[in-house]
């Protein structure tokens, strides 16, 4: 089993700290710079690539980072994660979001259930429901098709699904796969819900309430606001709402919803876009086939993340460079600048993914980190 040690106790980190600094202005200029752009690129899944030519590294730094990864047993720790080890020691839980899109290692069982089978079953249920909505088997009270889907959630129940929807919306329009327009309500300020409700035809809107516990105050407050708006419009809210929650929540078997789809405690909210949290709204918006393709792409990238060769593992390489920038070069922040308008909400999603995960100063209840946590993403 891999062992966990503070970064500053590793011999390879000390060696990394002593490597000569790279001056980007020198290495990025002229023919040498052009060659560097070609050389410092790692293939990703689905035709993408991770280019780190503009990062303050060279071959000597990369060699030191590879040594750090080996001493820190990064690949081994990731392998333990996807094989079902208790990685979330604070809550004594497995970490299983990767199982929502594929299985990298052994079958993982928790609470007497094969978790990959559980997530696949929920995806199949969502696909069946979405298809029935699209073909008119499930309609509003007047027998008319729903034309808009509105997700009600907060934090990871909003940031990831919203970023994914906006990333795919124009592509879907161009490829005739936009089935329903999607909107999102997340702010507990009633102006947020009011603005969305004023922009949609509530008689033809289907609302997705997302709360793992079924008790999230902000989300339930917004649900009450929406229910009141539906009531004022003479509509039965139970015919316009579905829930995404856990099987043990008070929402799971409530008559207030057309259907309930399930997630569990082994998927953190910020990682939940490929679970039912993202699956319901994205399948309704674009169709189950598009969401399935999204999962396939995520699974393909997951496989690269398991590669023990750092130079063939873009996720591990980027993480290591981030450690170097924060703890050796001393950079306090990282700017995320999407040139694509479709990715306009990606920075907010990434902020939660990275900073909520890697910004914690406590390793456990009794152990504080002696090194810097992640940089602030802006």
What annotation goes with each model-predicted range?
Residues 6-141:
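Extended, charge-enriched "interface" segments that sit outside catalytic cores
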Residues 119-135, 164-165, 170-203:
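Glycine-rich oxoanion-binding loops at beta->alpha junctions
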Residues 148-150, 206, 335:
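Conserved beta-strand elements of the Class I
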Residues 149-163, 271-276:
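Conserved phosphate/anionic-ligand binding catalytic regions in large, soluble enzymes, centered on
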Residues 159-175, 199-201, 223-231, 255-261:
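A glycine- and small-aliphatic-rich helix-loop capping segment at beta-alpha/alpha-beta transitions
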Residues 160, 164, 193, 209-230, ...:
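Extended, hydrophobic alpha-helical segments in both membrane/secreted and soluble proteins
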Residues 229-369, 375:
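Active-site phosphate/pyrophosphate-binding segments
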């Amino acid at each position: 089993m891999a062992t966990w040690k503070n970064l500053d106790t590793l011999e390879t980190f000390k060696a990394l700290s002593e490597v000569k600094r790279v001056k980007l202005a020198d290495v990025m200029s002229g023919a040498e710079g052009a060659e560097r752009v070609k050389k410092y690129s790692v293939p990703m899944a689905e035709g993408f690539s991770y280019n780190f030519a503009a990062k303050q590294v060279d071959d000597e730094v990369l060699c030191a980072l590879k040594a750090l990864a080996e001493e820190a047993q990064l690949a081994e720790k990731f392998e333990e994660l996807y094989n079902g080890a208790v990685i979330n020691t604070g809550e004594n839980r497995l970490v299983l979001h990767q199982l929502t899109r594929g299985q990298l290692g052994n079958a993982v069982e928790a609470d007497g259930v094969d978790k990959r089978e559980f997530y696949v079953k929920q995806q199949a249920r969502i696909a069946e429901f979405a298809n029935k909505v699209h073909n008119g088997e499930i309609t509003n009270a007047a027998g008319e098709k729903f034309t808009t889907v509105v997700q009600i959630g907060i934090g990871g129940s909003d940031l990831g699904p919203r970023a994914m929807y906006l990333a795919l919306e124009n592509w879907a329009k161009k490829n005739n796969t936009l089935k329903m327009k999607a909107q999102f309500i997340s702010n507990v300020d009633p102006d947020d819900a009011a603005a969305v409700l004023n922009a949609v035809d509530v008689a033809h809107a289907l609302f997705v309430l997302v709360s793992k516990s079924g008790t999230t105050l902000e989300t339930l407050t917004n649900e009450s606001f929406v229910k009141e708006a539906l009531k004022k419009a003479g509509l039965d809210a139970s015919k316009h709402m579905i829930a995404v929650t856990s099987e043990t929540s008070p929402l799971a078997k409530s008559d207030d919803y057309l259907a309930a789809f399930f997630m569990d405690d082994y998927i953190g909210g910020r990682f939940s876009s490929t679970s039912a949290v993202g699956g319901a709204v994205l399948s309704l918006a674009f169709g189950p086939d598009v969401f399935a393709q999204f999962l396939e792409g995520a699974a393909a990238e997951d496989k690269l993340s398991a590669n023990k060769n750092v130079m063939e593992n873009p996720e591990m390489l980027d993480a290591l460079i981030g450690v170097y920038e924060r703890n050796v070069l001393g950079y306090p922040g990282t700017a995320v600048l999407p040139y694509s308008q479709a990715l306009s909400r990606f920075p907010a999603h990434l902020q939660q993914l990275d900073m909520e995960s890697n910004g914690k100063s406590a390793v456990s209840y009794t152990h504080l980190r002696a090194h810097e946590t992640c940089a602030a993403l802006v």
